[in-house]
């Protein structure tokens, strides 16, 4: 499946079936996480069949149900953008494997992650087999997500991918532009905007093959 089609299919899911992640899917997921950790220097830690993290008032407030599997992304405070970038890379791999996901910032309970000095839990990703496939989020017009100009077709294809990216509270607090053939993106003020910046950068690069600075 083409990457853009995968992005179109993937939506946030908060309610899950009581179905284990095992067999070939679990093996492929574990292998992929290990490769991302090696590439990124982050510490992504998968928890399977662990219901306690989402058995809290905060999780119920966030409308999560039956979440028993999740990925904790651990890194340094200044690695939030990297967490978003590689986390979204993993999210789309989960989608390819037939799993549903949801980025989770605050609406969860205690997580027993392993951390090294200067590391902290940056964000979680809930995953599993959803009771539904989720719904598409509303997006700002592409012209509001990048500085107006006469951009080439590949840039606009990248912006289509960017418009499909999940962001905290669907705020889309970022701005893209191109100068002298180089694509730039910056985070605007907002909750978890640095993580969001990493997510949208991955969407653009994965579809176009062009680096975003």
Language-model features, listed with the residues they occupy:
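Acidic, surface-exposed loops and disordered segments
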Residues: 1-213
